[in-house]
Amino acid sequence: SRTLFLITALTVISLSNIYSQPEIKAVFTGKAPVIDGFVNDDVWANAAVINELYQKEPKTGEPISEKTEFLFLFDHNNIYVGIRCYDDPKGIIAKELARDVSLGEDDRIQVIFDTYLDGRSGYWFQLGPRGSIGDALINENGKYFNKAWDGIWNGKAKITSEGWEGELIIPYKTMGFNKSSDTWGLKCIRYVKRKSETATWPATSINADKFQVSDEGKLTGLTGMTQGIGLDLIPYITGGFSKKKDADAAPVIDLGMDAYYQITPSLKVALTVNTDFAQTEVDAKQINLTRFSLYFPEKRDFFLDGSNYFTFGINGDDDDIKNTSM
């Protein structure tokens, strides 16, 4: 029984070490790396490095089968993420190039920043080997995933002789955060498609939700960050001509603007004047032969920004806000 107790104790200690919430301290840089997809600038040599990812599947808890490195730098205006995904170049699966497309059939990495360290919400960023990028808002500990959100950031990736690598530059102004705190929640994920392998930092359980935030690690040392005045202005102007029968053509000009002001880290005011919906993606046409209304996902940016704060209750698991077509 003493031997059994010792084995049990060692197992518990081992599992607690694997599933603990580790910390990594971000490194400030006075020189920004060039975002070209190659993680070869000298500044990356001083970056904070995460290289211990653990499989969620297929072999839960075991180290990732392919060497992987996530590197973190920051300055006063941006946070930078470098990625090195070592692999056989012939085995890399990378088909997509466009933004915000599904990379479910590609190799890819994902980074989640829980900027308020609440263990429930976060900003999700994705990068594929050929440079396809995607982003989303996470709420309700991964149950709410709003991929219609488009942040202001950029990412590049390249396939190399040793695998593939990439770089992200994310301005602080694209994310809300508490300036009085120097710590964010952080989760790093790599998918190796041909092996059906998912690996994360920190380690997570097989039963964890796909975008779960509560099992995150911590990114510390984030000081001296600038959010600016927190004011975003998005003006627009459209022009054309209008001609009526038996009348000369007359010019037509239409003006409008959306404005967003971040009063506090958790309070934002939105104002719209003569809202422009011309750039909004058109809903797919559907023929409705029933007596029930059709529901379409909300795609207008003005109504999407901050919408996750109004998602709760029975409908809290829905992926998108819905508007109704009568």
Where are these regions (language model features)?
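Structural preference for beta-rich elements and adjacent junctions enriched in aromatics
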Residues: 20-326
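Positively charged n-region of N-terminal signal peptides that target proteins for export
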Residues: 1-3
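Bacterial N-terminal signal peptides
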Residues: 5-14
